[in-house]
Amino acid sequence: MTKQKEKRGRRWPWFVAVCVVATLRLFVFSNYVVEGKSMMPTLESGNLLIVNKLSYDIGPIRRFDIIVFHANKKEDYVKRVIGLPGDRIAYKNDILYVNGKKVDEPYLRPYKQKLLDGRLTGDFTLEEVTGKTRVPPGCIFVLGDNRLSSWDSRHFGFVKINQIVGKVDFRYWPFKQFAFQF
């Protein structure tokens, strides 16, 4: 075999690898950088995330999933899913009620313990903040984990399901905070 054929033979696997990575990046996974404090303490500004774009083509959106969605033409936001289509949402005395039943939010406990009065979320009903009694079909209701400082569905309303980029699969930076579970 000539040296030229050997070189071509070594380039082929690299070409295939680059094509596979580019395809995965374009259609399956995306990198995101967290900007701001709205998802603290779960996610912090500067965290690097991998978002699975196919998650909701394969399975359903679940309450408490952390998602990335197109907020407008220029910005994507990362928030937590609180309300699914058909849900009635309310907060009273810092407790989440979905369809009239208390729902525990264990991911907020560490943050609540740091607060002076232990209260993270002000009282509201879905109707008070959106004018609707239920989350409409084809929409979700999202909140940031830092409820005191988050621009979320309480301010901009429902997120259409077709605005969702994907589900946050894991945080890979900083490496000491590497996590699959949120």
UniProtKB/Swiss-Prot annotation:
PROSITE patterns: SPASE_I_1, SPASE_I_2, SPASE_I_3
Subcellular location: Cell membrane
Membrane-crossing segments per the record: 14-30
Entry-linked InterPro entries: LexA/Signal_pep-like_sf, Pept_S26A_signal_pept_1, Pept_S26A_signal_pept_1_CS, Pept_S26A_signal_pept_1_Lys-AS, Pept_S26A_signal_pept_1_Ser-AS, Peptidase_S26
EC number(s) per entry: 3.4.21.89
Active site: S38, K79
Membrane topology listed for this record: Single-pass type II membrane protein
GO biological processes: signal peptide processing
GO cellular component terms, A-Z: plasma membrane
Highest taxon listed in the record's lineage: Bacteria
Side of membrane Extracellular, spans: 31-182
Top-level EC class as recorded in UniProt: hydrolase
Gene Ontology molecular function, alphabetical: serine-type endopeptidase activity
Keyword vocabulary terms for this entry: Cell membrane, Hydrolase, Membrane, Protease, Transmembrane, Transmembrane helix
Presence of keyword Protease: yes
Keyword Transmembrane listed: yes
Positions in the Cytoplasmic compartment: 1-13
Pfam families from the UniProt entry: Peptidase_S26
Chief location category: membrane
Catalytic activity: Cleavage of hydrophobic, N-terminal signal or leader sequences from secreted and periplasmic proteins
Protein family according to the UniProt entry: Belongs to the peptidase S26 family.
Protein name according to UniProt: Signal peptidase I
